[in-house]
A protein has these predicted regions:
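Compositionally biased, proline/threonine/alanine/serine-rich low-complexity intrinsically disordered stretches
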Residues: 12-16, 164-165
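Residue-level marker of positions within ordered structural domains that often coincide
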Residues: 7, 29-30, 64
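Immediate post-signal-peptide N-terminus of mature secreted/exported proteins
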Residues: 14-50, 54
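Sec-dependent N-terminal signal peptides
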Residues: 1-12
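Mature extracellular/secreted ectodomains of secretory-pathway proteins
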Residues: 44-164
Length: 165
């Protein structure tokens, strides 16, 4: 019985395979390349992704298929975008823990749905406003809030083994 429990605990303690891959990709990209990737993504430019592609290839060691490569690239980008938007929000006094708390309270379908409706986004903004954040501050930082929320959704999809497209 103890052996079974020990094996079960060890299995639970092991990082999920996707987490190992994402960690590898994230750590393989330099801070300047991360900044460039984020800037290009936020500006809608589909360029400058060489560092990301290279990191995915190195970390995948030619063992990831195209879908897995896309998942690792998308997860890494989501981490970069989440961290960038978290920094921006924190700098203006909007703690991301409030967004995290709101997100965790949403049903599982919402947490993995890449199409956030205006009504759902309004619920988040109203919640933050109700916690004392000025509507002007929230409006001025709507892009960072939306980017942060979008990154949480993509990362939840990856965590659950769902495609990110």
């Amino acid at each position: 019985m103890i052996a079974v429990v020990s094996v079960a605990l060890l299995a639970l303690a092991q990082p999920k395979p996707h987490a190992i891959g994402v960690d590898c990709v994230v750590s393989a990209i330099s801070a300047p390349d991360r900044a460039s990737l984020v800037a290009n993504a936020l500006d809608g430019r589909a360029q400058g992704f060489d560092a990301l592609i290279s990191a995915v290839r190195i970390c995948g060691r030619d063992q990831w298929n195209a879908e897995q490569q896309g998942t690792m690239a998308g997860a890494a980008m989501s981490i970069f975008l989440r961290d960038d938007s978290a920094g921006k929000l924190t700098a203006v006094g909007v703690p991301t823990r409030e967004i995290d708390r709101w997100f965790s309270e949403q049903h599982a379908e919402f947490q993995t749905n890449t199409e956030v409706t205006d009504a759902e986004a309004t619920r988040l903004i109203d919640r933050l406003h109700g916690q004392g954040f000025a509507m002007e501050l929230l409006d001025a930082n709507g892009t960072a809030i939306g980017t942060y929320l979008g990154a949480l959704i993509i990362l939840r999809r990856v965590e659950q083994g769902l495609p990110i497209d």
